[in-house]
A protein has these predicted regions:
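Ser/Thr- (and often Asn-) enriched beta-sheet segments in non-cytosolic proteins
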Residues: 26-28, 92, 204, 211
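Residues at beta-strand starts and edge strands
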Residues: 38-43, 61-67, 87-89, 130, ...
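N-terminal onset of structured domains
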Residues: 22-65
């Protein structure tokens, strides 16, 4: 049994025509109350990342979405700003086609935390994009600075597609010796085309707070 690349192309072509109607994306980094600037991290949240047609189509067909977050804490200097701390985490959303439910997990320092299983895509989106307080080191009192957030949403990458094919279908099986499965030139070409039709392997977003001084 071979991968159904015809289905993938159909999904990509259909999704490409619906991108203009997607929900507006928002990415927010919200500071705590002023009295807690040196005691609590900001709240990171987003909306609309998983709402466009291409992402929903891919999710409903068993392809996972990965949201990679990187929060940076900077201090403000007279001439230059200085990066003082970073914190990275991932949120992964996967649709179980057989069980007909969405699975949402957060991965921090290689530790996986389940955020729940949901029957609807909207519920899964709310869980994936809801407020999160990352455990980044906090500024000292009197230290002027700001937080900057970098977010990459992987709509579909070549490596992810290969992993999905192995995990969900068992069709790609690398040799035990460690050699890569050669596949076919046609298969690799179609997978590349699917990625391009979807608008690239990643979508990048940024957000930052205003400058503050605890």
């Amino acid at each position: 049994m071979k991968p159904n690349f015809t289905l993938l192309l159909a999904i990509a072509l259909l999704s490409a025509s619906t991108l203009g109607a997607q929900k507006k994306v928002r990415v927010d980094v919200v500071l705590p109350a002023e009295s807690a600037w040196a005691e609590e991290p900001p709240a990171v949240s987003s909306s609309g990342l998983l709402s466009d047609g291409s992402m929903r189509d891919l999710l409903s067909n068993g392809f996972p979405a990965r949201l990679h977050y990187r929060l940076e804490r900077w201090t403000s200097g007279r001439w230059f700003d200085d990066l003082k701390a970073t914190f990275d985490w991932d949120v992964i959303v996967k649709y179980d086609v057989l069980g007909k439910k969405y699975q949402v997990v957060r991965v921090v320092n290689k530790k996986v935390e389940s955020l729940g299983e949901f029957a609807g895509g909207g519920e899964a989106e709310n869980a994936a994009e809801g407020p999160y307080h990352p455990a980044i080191s906090l500024p000292k009192k009197g230290q002027r600075g700001y937080y900057n957030l970098l977010l990459d949403v992987e709509t579909l990458s070549l490596s992810d597609l290969d992993e999905v094919e192995r995990w969900l279908r068992g069709e790609l099986k690398p040799a035990v010796s460690g050699k890569k499965n050669p596949g076919t030139a046609l298969g690799r070409g179609v997978r590349t085309l699917v990625v391009r039709l979807l608008g690239g392997e990643k979508r990048h977003y940024e957000a930052r707070t205003g400058k503050f001084k605890p």
